[in-house]
Amino acid sequence: MEKNRTNIFSVYLMITFLLISIFITMVMSDGEATIINAPNRCPPGHVVVKGRCRIAG
C-alpha cells in the first residue's frame, strides 16, 4: 500500500511540474512575441529594409 501511495504522489508531482513548465513557456513566448512585433523606429529620412534602417533615396 505504501509503494502505491508513493507512485500516486510521484505522478501528481510530475503533472504539477508539467503544468508549471507549460505556463512559464506560454508567458515567456508571449513576452518575446511582443518584443519581436515592436515596430522599428528609424530617424527621419530613413526607411526600414530587412529590419535595418537605411537612408531613403
Swiss-Prot record:
Localization of this protein: Secreted
Signal peptide coordinates: 1-29
Transmembrane domains' residue ranges: none
Post-translational modification: O-glycosylated.
GO cellular component: extracellular region
Tissue: Expressed by the venom gland.
Disulfide bonds: C42-C53
Alanine amide modifications at: A56
Keywords: Amidation, Disulfide bond, Glycoprotein, Hemostasis impairing toxin, Secreted, Signal, Toxin
Positions of the propeptide segment: 30-33
Primary subcellular site in the record, as a coarse category: secreted
Stated role: Serine protease inhibitor which exhibits antifibrinolytic, antielastolytic and antimicrobial activities. Displays antimicrobial activity against bacteria and fungi. Likely functions in the innate immune response to microbial infection and possibly in the venom, as an antifibrinolytic agent.
Family listed: Belongs to the secapin family.
Protein name: U17-myrmicitoxin-Tb1a
